[in-house]
């Protein structure tokens, strides 16, 4: 019995002597852990901050670009359409697109279908054709490309590969006619795809009914 008590006492003393060293070692390891994690976190944080900053700068550049770019207002200035004009819109897409009031009404409809960029692109091409200054033409052509042709743009219009190749060649030396093929393709797309739906839309029917009622009252 006495020998067993002596042995137990020795074990307790040995355990007591080991505890400070073990605790110190654990404390040291604990200190290294947070420092290492902090270092990693700082590196990751720096990378994330740089990424966010670059994205913000790009966003600001794009916003500035768009503000300077088209000069195309939310709607064109035009007198209110007459009943005769609105009836003429139903005769052909060309007659609709010839008048500012017709383009405004059609553009309002395209906005409901999230395809307003087609009209914006067409209008930008029309503006480009009116320019004669070489430097202005080059700048407008570049902006049109970035806004409506680039696959990175949220307002990219739908064009086939052949037309895109033509544009890329034309952009080597931009002119008023750089986007003629693309403009025709988008015009045809609006004519065949969006125009029939516009003629059956509430926007067109409400306008026609309103003008008809005013005509009767007069």
Swiss-Prot record:
GO terms for biological process: negative regulation of signal transduction. It is a lipid-anchor. It is found in: Membrane; Nucleus; Cytoplasm. The keyword Nucleus applies. InterPro entries: RGS, RGS_sf, RGS_subdomain_2. CDD domains: RGS_RGS20. Keywords: Cytoplasm, Glycoprotein, Lipoprotein, Membrane, Nucleus, Palmitate, Signal transduction inhibitor, Ubl conjugation. It comes from the Eukaryota. The keyword Nucleus applies. Residues 1-10 have a biased composition (Basic and acidic residues). It holds the Pfam family RGS. Residues 1-26 are annotated as: Disordered. Its main location: membrane. Residues 92-208 form the RGS domain. SUPFAM superfamilies: Regulator of G-protein signaling, RGS. One of its GO terms (cellular component) is cytoplasm. Fatty acylated. Heavily palmitoylated in the cysteine string motif. Residues 14-26 have a biased composition (Polar residues). Forms a complex with G(alpha)z/i2 subunits and mu-opioid receptors; the formation of this complex results in mu-opioid receptor desensitization. Interacts with OPRM1. Inhibits signal transduction by increasing the GTPase activity of G protein alpha subunits thereby driving them into their inactive GDP-bound form. Binds selectively to G(z)-alpha and G(alpha)-i2 subunits, accelerates their GTPase activity and regulates their signaling activities. The G(z)-alpha activity is inhibited by the phosphorylation and palmitoylation of the G-protein. Negatively regulates mu-opioid receptor-mediated activation of the G-proteins. PANTHER family: REGULATOR OF G PROTEIN SIGNALING, REGULATOR OF G-PROTEIN SIGNALING 20. This is Regulator of G-protein signaling 20. It comes from Gallus gallus (Chicken).
């Amino acid at each position: 019995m006495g020998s067993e008590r002596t042995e137990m006492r020795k074990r307790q003393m040995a355990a007591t002597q080991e505890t400070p060293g073990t605790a110190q070692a654990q404390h040291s390891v604990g200190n290294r852990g947070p420092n290492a994690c902090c270092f990693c976190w700082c590196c990751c944080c720096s990378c994330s901050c740089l990424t966010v900053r670059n994205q913000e700068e790009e966003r600001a550049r794009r916003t500035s670009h768009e503000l300077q770019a088209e000069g195309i207002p939310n709607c064109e200035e035009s007198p209110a359409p007459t009943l005769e004009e609105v009836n003429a819109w139903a005769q052909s897409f060309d007659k609709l697109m010839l008048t500012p009031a017709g383009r405004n009404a059609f553009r309002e409809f395209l906005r409901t279908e999230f395809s307003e960029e087609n009209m914006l692109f067409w209008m930008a091409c029309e503006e480009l054709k009116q320019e004669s200054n070489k430097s202005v033409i080059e700048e407008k052509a570049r902006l049109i490309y970035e806004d409506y042709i680039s696959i990175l743009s949220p307002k990219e219009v739908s064009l086939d590969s052949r037309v895109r190749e033509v544009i890329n060649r034309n952009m080597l030396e931009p002119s008023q006619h750089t986007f003629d093929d693309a403009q025709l393709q988008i015009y045809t797309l609006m004519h065949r795809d969006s125009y029939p739906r516009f003629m059956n839309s509430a926007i067109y029917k409400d306008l026609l009914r309103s003008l008809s009622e005013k005509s009767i009252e007069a």
